[in-house]
Curated annotation (Swiss-Prot):
Belongs to the CWC15 family. This is Spliceosome-associated protein CWC15 homolog. It is found in: Nucleus. Keywords: Acetylation, Coiled coil, mRNA processing, mRNA splicing, Nucleus, Phosphoprotein, Spliceosome. Residues 24-34 have a biased composition (Polar residues). The gene is CWC15. It comes from Homo sapiens (Human). The lineage of its organism: Eukaryota, Metazoa, Chordata, Craniata, Vertebrata.
Length: 229
């Protein structure tokens, strides 16, 4: 929006402005919009996903590192369990130290066992994801190969049909092909006036009729028979 119509609170006066003591000098008035605003060039940072940077990145390794960091953060935020009773002062026995007779499916697991179980489950999930990815890639490759093979077969079929339809001898051998017609089509200029003018015009006697051709007219025929032949 323009500010040209707004009033000036401090109009410019020659030689009487700020820092102007000489009346012979021209008055100078500056605005904040006249000052340079962008004095530095902005460069692309390393974290702005440049094409070269994206090509050189290992997304699988970064994903695995983020998963491990998230697991460590989750384990760090988990509150430690403190037991006030005298029976729970000592640490819980490990799973391998518990006799087989005392094992029960309802017994809770320790923190270390829980961490090991989570790491194993994460590894299993990663392996399952990679296997699913390889399966999808293989299915897409097979689908692409099948489509290319079908396209080649269709092109070959069309080419053979064109070859067979272009040869009339081969068309006659096919029972499903319609009977070919070798009759010569009548030309469009068969009944024009100036075609074969002197061919067989005197063999038969015809009734007098008007012909728009001086060489085929009755007067010309009589004149040629009388004075030329």
């Amino acid at each position: 929006m323009t500010t040209a119509a707004r009033p000036t609170f401090e109009p410019a006066r020659g030689g009487r402005g700020k820092g102007e003591g000489d009346l012979s000098q021209l008055s100078k008035q500056y605005s904040s919009r006249d000052l340079p605003s962008h004095t530095k060039i902005k460069y692309r940072q390393t974290t702005q996903d440049a094409p070269e940077e994206v090509r050189n990145r290992d997304f699988r390794r970064e994903l695995e590192e983020r998963e491990r960091a998230a697991a460590r953060e989750k384990n760090r935020d988990r509150p430690t369990r403190e037991h006030t009773t005298s029976s729970s002062v000592s640490k819980k026995p490990r799973l391998d130290q518990i006799p087989a007779a005392n094992l029960d499916a309802d017994d809770p697991l320790t923190d270390e066992e829980d961490e090991d179980f989570e790491e194993e489950s994460d590894d299993d999930d990663t392996a399952a994801l990679l296997a699913e990815l390889e399966k999808i890639k293989k299915e897409r490759a097979e689908e692409q190969a099948r489509k290319e093979q079908e396209q080649k077969a269709e092109e070959e079929r069309i080419r053979m049909e064109n070859i067979l339809s272009g040869n009339p001898l081969l068309n006659l051998t096919g029972p499903s092909q319609p009977q070919a017609n070798f009759k010569v089509k009548r030309r469009w200029d068969d009944d024009v006036v100036f075609k074969n003018c002197a061919k067989g015009v005197d063999d038969q006697k015809k009734d007098k009729r008007f012909v728009n051709d001086t060489l085929r007219s009755e007067f010309h025929k009589k004149f040629m028979e009388k004075y030329i032949k």
